[in-house]
Amino acid sequence: MSQLLAAGGRRLSGEVTIQGAKNSVLPILAATLLTADTVVLRRCPRLKDVEASIRILEALGCTARWQDDALVVDTAGMNGCAIPDALMREMRSSVIFLGAILARCGQAALSSPGGCELGP
């Protein structure tokens, strides 16, 4: 078994740049529905699932725009509680919007999620 030994007693300092990750940003995009304020997500990756999430937000009446490497989401205009079937089928993780829509609207309507088929 290999080991990593760290000798203590020395102060750590410096900077680490954290890059955006799809598995982090998708739940955060859904969580933007929990506020009626503008949310700015810096170093947001421009991926197909992120774009699909943006289309879901827009279908609910929200706005989203790219500003350099940041995604600016404004949910003040949210006026719906149903995600269209076509958007639900774009990605398997679209179901993550359910909790935030329920919290904000008190009800939600969505079909089965889509995305890549898993298994035989």
Language model features with spans:
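Short, structured segments at the rim of ligand-binding sites
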Residues: 1-120
